[in-house]
């Protein structure tokens, strides 16, 4: 398993941890978001817009942190995790 180097970003009171991952010609940034009890992973891809984050984003939360995940996002995360 590849060891990720996490970089910290701060957006107001929101702390974000980001790590770069490269695979199959694609580059993804993975941001681990922690805000109080809320925790999530944000997956950035190419050519997608998001109103909050400056790059394209696939966003989901960890089910144990907040139960708002849906199947599509969950499957996306499983697919990207295979590249790490």
Where are these regions (language model features)?
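Short N-terminal "domain-start" leader segments
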Residues: 1-46
């Amino acid at each position: 398993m590849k060891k990720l180097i996490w970089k910290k970003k701060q957006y107001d009171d929101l702390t974000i941890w980001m790590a770069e991952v490269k695979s199959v010609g694609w580059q993804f940034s993975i941001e681990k978001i922690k805000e109080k009890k809320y925790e999530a992973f944000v997956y950035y891809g190419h050519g997608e817009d998001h109103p909050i984050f400056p790059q394209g984003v696939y966003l989901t939360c960890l089910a144990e942190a907040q139960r708002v995940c849906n199947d599509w996002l969950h499957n996306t995360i499983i697919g990207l995790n295979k590249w790490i």
